[in-house]
């Protein structure tokens, strides 16, 4: 019988029954660059840590199991993972990419990969006729779902059908949902990307990235690339992610429950003109999420009545931190215009719906009463200042 995902976050089934070093329950950190050989032509299975390291190998097997893939690759950051994946493509290849992506991905595609001869079509994969953009040289479709930061939801099965009809690789960045809530490979994707810095590690204390695949041809190419480029994750960082993953399930559930309540509270505030959270029934992707995921996650985006109100929130929050990142135990609020999407041209940001009054929340695991209490205080202070010191 298949094991539940909470169990898979803690136990690697294939290792059970084997005696770990001294019976240690915490997987060891093999902090070594190289390995001694018993004799010429003989190896312990590890030769040099750029090629592979026992701690990294254990982590990769754990992440592959969580995403139901045949292999995973642990890299030094989420952007390192995307950069390595782009090495699968050659000059002249064409990739269809969603227009609403993390700003770092957009920067990589248009400032680095295009310079190297890869062509991109940036479209709204939720609404545009994706198939009409497929050309003779198209090799892949690249999506996030939900997207960063506008929380658009793409039908993964629909994208997988298009990819298969045209022999394309479907790549899904699953960072916002984590393997706990969504498994794109099970829905027809070929490759899954994660910024392991976010929910997988979950404590804002390390950088990591992952590529997971269920295709042997892609697995073979990626194993060669990680060996050749030297982008593998260091042993101590691997251990930090392993430790964080053990509590993935309870963190995701608590964060999601908090996000639902905060979204509902924000909907009642007159200064908030829009709350974008897939868990709300009025979200355009709500029904798709119910079909392809086991939850709605803990990311949400809001539009405020003005830039001034948005900036005032950023200045006044204290327990909620104004910081760039997501997926940790702390609740963070981010200003996409100057942070995650600062390098995206203004006209593209605005076309995607990102304005100077847009804020993105990564909801953490604090007591919900404390989170809503702080937001209530912050909103009240701003309203009072707007009214010249008079309470509204």
Q: Which stretches of residues belong to each language-model region?
A:
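PLP-dependent enzyme catalytic core of the Aspartate aminotransferase-like
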Residues: 103, 119-121, 251, 308, ...
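N-terminal "arm"/small-domain region of PLP-dependent enzymes with the aminotransferase-like
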Residues: 1-53, 59-62
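Conserved PLP-enzyme active-site core in the AAT-like
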Residues: 1, 17-18, 72-271, 276, ...
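A common structural junction motif
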Residues: 229-230, 317-327, 378-387
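Conserved N-terminal alpha-helix of the aminotransferase class I/II PLP-enzyme fold
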Residues: 34-83, 87-88, 104-111
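Glycine-rich beta-alpha junction loops
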Residues: 14-16, 31-37, 176, 198, ...
């Amino acid at each position: 019988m298949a094991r539940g995902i909470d169990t898979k976050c803690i136990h690697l089934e294939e290792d059970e029954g084997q005696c770990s070093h001294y019976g240690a329950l915490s997987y060891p950190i093999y902090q070594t660059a190289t390995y001694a050989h018993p004799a010429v032509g003989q190896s312990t299975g590890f030769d040099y840590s750029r090629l592979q390291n026992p701690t990294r190998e254990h982590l990769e097997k754990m992440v592959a199991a969580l995403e139901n893939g045949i292999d995973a690759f642990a890299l030094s950051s989420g952007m390192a993972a995307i950069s390595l994946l782009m090495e699968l493509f050659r000059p002249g290849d064409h990739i269809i990419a969603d227009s609403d992506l993390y700003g770092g991905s957009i920067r990589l595609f248009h400032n680095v990969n295009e310079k190297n001869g890869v062509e991109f079509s940036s479209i709204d994969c939720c609404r545009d006729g994706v198939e009409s953009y497929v050309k003779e040289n198209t090799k892949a479709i690249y999506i996030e779902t939900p997207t960063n930061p506008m929380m658009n939801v793409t039908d993964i099965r629909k994208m997988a059908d298009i990819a298969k009809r045209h022999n394309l690789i479907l790549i899904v960045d699953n960072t916002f949902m984590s393997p706990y809530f969504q498994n794109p490979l099970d829905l027809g994707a070929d490759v899954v990307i994660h910024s392991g810095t976010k929910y997988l590690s979950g404590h804002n204390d390390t950088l990591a990235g992952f590529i997971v695949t269920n295709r042997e041809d892609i697995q073979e190419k990626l194993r060669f690339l990680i060996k050749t480029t030297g982008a593998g994750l260091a042993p101590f960082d691997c251990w930090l992610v392993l430790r964080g993953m053990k509590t993935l399930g309870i963190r995701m559930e608590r964060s999601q429950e908090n996000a639902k309540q905060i979204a509902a509270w924000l909907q009642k505030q007159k200064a908030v003109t829009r709350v974008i959270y897939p868990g709300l029934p009025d979200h355009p992707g709500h029904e798709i999420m119910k079909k392809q995921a086991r939850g709605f996650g803990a990311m949400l985006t809001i539009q405020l009545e003005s830039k001034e109100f948005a900036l005032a929130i950023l200045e006044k929050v204290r327990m909620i931190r104004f910081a760039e990142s997501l997926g940790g135990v702390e609740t963070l609020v981010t200003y996409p215009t100057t942070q995650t999407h600062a390098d995206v041209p203004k006209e593209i940001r605005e076309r995607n719906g990102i304005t100077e009054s847009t804020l993105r929340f990564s909801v953490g695991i604090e007591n919900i009463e404390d989170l809503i209490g702080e937001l209530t205080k912050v909103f009240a202070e701003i309203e009072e200042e707007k009214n010249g010191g008079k309470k509204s």
